[in-house]
Amino acid sequence: MAVDMHSFAKPEDVVVNHLSLDLNVDFKLQKISGSAILKLNRVSNASVVFLDTKALKIFKVTDSKGTPLKFELEKEVPFLGQALKISLQPNTREIIVIYETTAGSSALQWLSPAQTLGGKHGFLFTQGQAILSRTWIPLQDSPGIRFTWDAKIHVPTEMMAVMSGTNPTAKNAKGDYSFKMNKAVPAYLIALAVGDLEFKELGPRTGVYAEPSMLGKAVYEFGDLENMLSSAEALYGKYLWDRYDVIVLPPSFPFGGMENPMLTFATPTIIAGDRSLTSLVAHELAHSWSGNLVTNKTWDDFWLNEGFTVYFERRIMESLYGKDYAAMLAVLGYQDLIETIADLGDTSEDTHLKLKLEGRDPDDGMNDIAYEKGCLLLLQIEKMKGREAFDQFINNYFNYFAFSSITTEDFLSYIEKELQLTAEEIKVLKRWIYAPGIPKDLPAPQSSLFIAVNNTLTKFVSGNLTANELNVQSWSTHEWLQFIRSIPDNISLTNLKDLDDTFKFTNSENSEIRFAWLMKSIPAGYLNADISLDEFLSRVGRRKFVLPLFKMMLKVPRLETHASELYTKTRDGYHAVTVQSLDELFNKK
């Protein structure tokens, strides 16, 4: 049995199979307080249960009749927090924990009215993955342990609460909201957001939540959501979570998206105005199968969540927009992977698909290895066995393991039987999973559209065409990203200015384009972008953008001191997930 080194829980003795929350959200004191009722399955005759907690105040623990139970918070362990050890009576099947969060509850980000679009009310959201749910709920915080849950959440009357379960579509005059999730999920998939929110339906099963002034833009941007859902079902079977809604969060949200069941949490940086960045939503939707339905049992197996999801996301995009479109995504993803491998070192164990994260924060494994190397492995299997056979395998895989958590080794033994792999094929798979880097002879993905982009760039750099003369009117975001990423490092400032004057990259509303431009133009000495860089880092907290930009600043002599000063100013506006990565960066310096 796989042991989760990132949880104090002992599921071989006691397993939580249902959680009931009754919580009050206090914006003035910036804390959540109330009770968690946990129903227990007593697997062995052990007389204690261990829950995961971090930065929680525990006031009292009782059984279902209100009889106090003896408890203690054990010694704190870095990253993991403290085990809450509770003594059980022989007939205890339910425990009630009375508790509150603290300033150290790093899943929570409390935003002031000034950090929201509306500017009138605060905002709260949670981010549980990987092991932060324990900072706002005492529970068994392991991806290998699944349970159903329900919740009563009490919030200020001018706000709406939404969760990763059944959701309201309008504000409640009393500020009292009830939720339930009747399918067993791991702890990291419990999420809460509270703010001045409105809802708009997009289709029979889809809708969007956002602050009122963002709602119209979000409705347009996610107009293809119902089609995406149908495409996903056509590929890999029925959607089993009833509704699929998206909430657009304030810009400090640390990720592009988070696949909370029934309600994807999304960054506003994907609102580009032209639906060009919605592959991120296809990714989170795909997680409704890979990750939420079939989950990595430990964080060492994270690639099972993400490799499958990237593969599935690109298949959705291919079915909606064609092979050329999906090929562009594959090339950009491959570029990110090569950069990550170079960063980690091509012999590093961190470039294995199966990780060894014991004694480390599992967040360390959340990079492009799991996503892009994982996807490349699945593409290799597709090539080996043919798309039709591989699609059938994936359908069977999701059905067979539905609502369970599995290890890499479970995957290997299942695929070996299902696809009747030869000894040589198994060897190839194991090399991908347990060896570093990617095979040297692996051909890089190609995109015919990007070849045309590269030709256009060559004409510009060689001086044959000015920026104004480039034939780019029909380009997608992905073509622009290829163009900007491929600009040579020794490009002249005159050329950079010509591009910027023509295409307004420095202040682009498209966050991916603006990020790529800042990463390219600032090291080249293009001073006009410096103000835009400061503004972007002061407003956006998405780690994918913020961490590389600060890393880049520290390598540019004129900005090295400024980077530290700017981080001191912006740090309080970022979520703890982003702060942790940046603190490491600046402490290493």
Language-model-derived ranges and their functions:
Residues 56, 184, 270-271, 522:
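Hydrophobic pocket-lining residues within nucleotide cofactor-binding pockets
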Residues 58, 80, 179, 208-463:
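Hydrophobic alpha-helical and helix-loop surface patches within well-folded domains
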Residues 47, 67, 91, 173-174, ...:
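Generic alpha-helical secondary structure signal
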Residues 1-242, 366-368, 385:
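Acidic/His-enriched low-complexity segments
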Residues 44-45, 65-68, 90-92, 169-176, ...:
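Short, glycine- and charge-enriched coil/turn segments that flank and shape catalytic ligand pockets
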